[in-house]
Amino acid sequence: MPRNTALEKYRNIGICAHVDAGKTTTTERILFYTGLSHKIGEVHDGAATMDWMEQEQERGITITSAATTTFWSGMDQQFDKHRINIIDTPGHVDFTIEVERSLRVLDGAVVVFCGSSGVEPQSETVWRQANKYGVPRIVFVNKMDRSGADFERVCGQIRTRLKANVVPVQLNIGAEEDFKGVVDLIRMKAIMWNEADQGLTYDLVDIPAELQDRAEELRMEMMEAAAEASEELMDKYLEEGELSNEEIKQGLRARVLANEIVLAFCGSAFKNKGVQAVLDGVVEYLPAPNQVPAIKCETEDGEPASRSSSDDEPFAALAFKLATDPFVGNLTFIRVYSGVLKSGDAVYNPVKGKKERVGRIVQMHANKREEIKEVRAGDIAACIGLKDVTTGDTLCDLDKPVILERMDFPEPVISVAVEPKTKADQEKMSIALGKLAAEDPSFRVKTDEESGQTIISGMGELHLDIIVDRMRREFKVEANVGNPQVAYRETIRGTVEQNSKFVRQSGGRGQYGHVVVKFEPLEVSTNDAGEEKIFEFVDEIVGGVIPKEFIGPVAKGIEEQMTNGVLAGYPMIGVKATLFDGSYHDVDSSEMAFKIAGSMALKEGAKKANACILEPIMKVEVVTPEDYLGDVMGDLNRRRGIIEGMDENPSGRVVSALVPLAEMFGYATNVRSMSQGRASFSMEFKKYAEVPNNIADEIIKSRNS
């Protein structure tokens, strides 16, 4: 059965932004204009189509990325029908992981900014993630009807704070309550949307006289940006001083796809202005699946390979999200990179080494679903019936297996103990937590060996609140939650040479392992794939004083001891161990003996190497009206915060600070009462840093008591 839509007419895009930039409203309008939803869902009525979990509707934020398929032929029906797969991503920093996994499977993104508050901390995080995956993007400056909205100021912030080369393709006509429409700098006409039909129709009129000069300046800048795409465009531009509209679009598209420029659009989704122009921009400037580089992967033997976006290549897809659906059970969202998959086909999961059969395939329209018979390269769909798949796994052809690059997930920074309110719920709670952990890799569950408590860990207080809330709603488990615990770490500050010997003689065969190891601090670094290097082992044994087969176990022993720490039982990071001497016994030495000797060496050596405790430091940004600035800063100082800088923004002052996570619990309530509800804040993990001695002593005492 042939394709319904040619691959070059596909667009897989994400809509990402800061918490309140109006992302979900923008997506709602897109669904309305593309004819998918007949009544516009407003977020503040708790009715938006894309926000389908109960908590999202209550809290007015988007938590899980809903995937939706829709079609668009242009504002003037100027294109053939294009198929747009949209993923609406959350903007709250505790759910960065959802954004990360969406960007991993998208080909392009629309980043939404608020016209008045501009570039906010979360926007920086999203931007960094999009850079990491090389995602071409366009910008929509929304909420142009809000007080303090200023399109050109926001473009300036994107240049300075995000270091992006922004090229406006529109200019706003009026702002705040006088926002009327936009100037299209390519056609050099003003677009005025009609209020009467929720902006479905519009008029093309002449540019208002007072904006003519500025529009011409911006058009020149845009034309120069387009001319830089190729030598022929540049030559023509230098000779004639002008490019045709088609040439401008062609040049801009080439540079967006090369990630050299970012085009800026503006409007107000809530007031139904500007969204269709962004949809045209998606079609005109963002890539089809076969216009992005072929996806890199490796064979099962670790040889590099690639899969290009074509139905004729062997099947390969990435499972980028799991969700539990009340009617059909487990849904596995997949992005198909190559080949074709029909319902009922068997696929191979090389990460788990297992064969699975796909029961049914459904296409999601927010939380409504339509069953389909097959998916092809470029499609995003959900499979029903896969049993043993986790987020980030590859699904591929049985005969030509490849492993797509794994997704990388951050380590949680906060933990709480949970226990079911009734003993009868213990098993239900375990099942619920297991399902939630499979869905969300930044959420971990473990049992504390000493206390037997169930400990859940995540990216922030809101993240864990929502997990506990979902246990109650979706799995009917009521749980008591303990006080939040910080994910402390341990490390060493000095260098030491440690001589450790493990000898045991008790009749029969003894045990003998002797090592001399140099321990020194290691700078914790992150590689291109985002993996952290926290331990390095160097083998400098010469002349066989320790036989080869015992060297691996020494490293293993040290690593195992690192997970248990040496001061207060917290995992260690930043250790370099060099094994340079030792001895062995012909009969009594064994792998086990050397493993124990390795772990003893670290335990004894770390204390001499000035071991210390590290705590997570958060980057906190508080937006506060001028009147409460003194209180906010005084409070951050009391929380051991270091103020990094101050900025202006239309809603007041922005204070940036580095504050230990341990001091930030319950901050949301404090900052609200301090400012009578007018200040807001966001925080994300920045780094680990040493805990002051007096606090470290308390931590060690309470852990060891």
Swiss-Prot record:
BP-aspect Gene Ontology terms: ribosome disassembly
Keywords, in A-Z order: Cytoplasm, Elongation factor, GTP-binding, Nucleotide-binding, Protein biosynthesis
Coiled coil: none
Subcellular location: Cytoplasm
Listed GO CC annotations: cytoplasm
Major localization listed first in the record, in broad terms: cytoplasm
Matching SUPFAM superfamilies: EF-G C-terminal domain-like, P-loop containing nucleoside triphosphate hydrolases, Ribosomal protein S5 domain 2-like, Translation proteins
Domain tr-type G: 8-290
Top-rank taxon: Bacteria
SMART domains: EFG_C, EFG_IV
MF-aspect GO terms: GTP binding; GTPase activity; guanosine tetraphosphate binding; translation elongation factor activity
Pfam family, one: GTP_EFTU
Residues annotated to bind GTP: 17-24, 88-92, 142-145
Family, per entry: Belongs to the TRAFAC class translation factor GTPase superfamily. Classic translation factor GTPase family. EF-G/EF-2 subfamily.
Function statement: Catalyzes the GTP-dependent ribosomal translocation step during translation elongation. During this step, the ribosome changes from the pre-translocational (PRE) to the post-translocational (POST) state as the newly formed A-site-bound peptidyl-tRNA and P-site-bound deacylated tRNA move to the P and E sites, respectively. Catalyzes the coordinated movement of the two tRNA molecules, the mRNA and conformational changes in the ribosome.
PANTHER family given in the database record: RIBOSOME-RELEASING FACTOR 2, MITOCHONDRIAL (PTHR43261:SF1), TRANSLATION ELONGATION FACTOR G-RELATED (PTHR43261)
Protein's name according to its UniProt entry: Elongation factor G
Originating species: Francisella philomiragia subsp. philomiragia (strain ATCC 25017 / CCUG 19701 / FSC 153 / O#319-036)
